[in-house]
């Protein structure tokens, strides 16, 4: 799938297979995104989905209300369609 990442330094579109976490694909493409635990248990890598769908069933940090607003943990999110994500959204969670 095509994953568009809107970062503070600009917009990048990368290819991300449906079995690869978005954070991992971004790193392979040379992008520097924030992360900490890489296990879906903190909010360092949080982003916000602007369009498209992801599967983040491996995460354990976000509550239903946060996910309902479109927040996503990129370290444990797989794309299930072409998706656009606003990165660096940890502060917006709180």
Curated annotation (Swiss-Prot):
Residues 1-91 form the 2Fe-2S ferredoxin-type domain. The keyword Iron-sulfur applies. The keyword Transmembrane does not apply. GO terms for cellular component: chloroplast. It comes from the Eukaryota. [2Fe-2S] cluster binds at residues 37, 42, 45, 75. It is found in: Plastid, Chloroplast. Disulfide bonds: none annotated. GO terms for biological process: electron transport chain. Ferredoxins are iron-sulfur proteins that transfer electrons in a wide variety of metabolic reactions. Keywords: 2Fe-2S, Chloroplast, Electron transport, Iron, Iron-sulfur, Metal-binding, Phosphoprotein, Plastid, Transport. It comes from Scenedesmus fuscus. Its cofactor is [2Fe-2S] cluster. Binds 1 [2Fe-2S] cluster. GO terms for molecular function: 2 iron, 2 sulfur cluster binding; electron transfer activity; metal ion binding. PROSITE patterns: 2FE2S_FER_1, 2FE2S_FER_2. Belongs to the 2Fe2S plant-type ferredoxin family. The modification Phosphoserine is found at residue 9. InterPro entries: 2Fe-2S_ferredoxin-like_sf (IPR036010), 2Fe-2S_ferredoxin-type (IPR001041), 2Fe2S_fd_BS (IPR006058), Beta-grasp_dom_sf (IPR012675), Fd_pln (IPR010241). This is Ferredoxin.
């Amino acid at each position: 799938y095509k994953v568009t990442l809107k970062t503070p330094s600009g917009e990048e579109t990368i290819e991300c297979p449906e079995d690869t976490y978005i954070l991992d694909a971004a790193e392979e493409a040379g992008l520097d995104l924030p992360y900490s635990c890489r296990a879906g248990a903190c909010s360092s890598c949080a982003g916000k989905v602007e369009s498209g769908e992801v599967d983040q069933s491996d995460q354990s940090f976000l509550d239903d209300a946060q996910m309902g607003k479109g927040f996503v943990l990129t370290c444990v999110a797989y794309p299930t369609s072409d998706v656009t994500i606003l990165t660096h959204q940890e502060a917006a969670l709180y």
